[in-house]
Amino acid sequence: AKEVLQRVGLFDTGFHLYGWEDLELGERLRRTGVQLIKCPAAVGYHWHPALTLDQIPRLIEVEGERARMGLVFFRKHPTRRVRFIIQFTWLHRLLWELLTLGGLINEHSLRPLLRWLIRHGYPGTAMELLRLPLNRIGVRALFQEARLAGLR
């Protein structure tokens, strides 16, 4: 395993903001023909603190970072596969616009419901609900960054 990582390279330090460096390494490994071995006994966790309303501005900021780093990923691997991974397709753009009713469901309109869910012990449900506008924000940011960079 060490030899394979040395051959394809470690995490790319060009990913200096949040997002995609792990999947980009995986894409390089996949392209060299490394076989995926599933190990159901292996467990991994992504720990996130319970959602609070104070976290929302940072979560929105992270979506902008993910958009910028998504383009770093796409420039390295300009494939349809990577477009789908980073949600850089018109299908994704349409999906998140529809699911948020064109932005009517957003971090502001959801705030009372999010507050209620958090107050009543459902911060996880609140976070899942907040993912709708966050995904819309992220996909819009990705398309905006791509336009500024001259990518389509």
Residue ranges with predicted function:
Residues 3-9, 14-43:
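A short, conserved alpha-helix in the catalytic core of glycosyltransferases
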Residues 16, 35, 39-57, 69-73:
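Active-site donor/metal-binding and catalytic loop motifs
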Residues 27-29, 47, 102-106:
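Juxtamembrane/interface motifs at transmembrane-helix termini
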Residues 61-65, 82-152:
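Non-catalytic, C-terminal membrane-associated alpha-helical segments of glycosyltransferases
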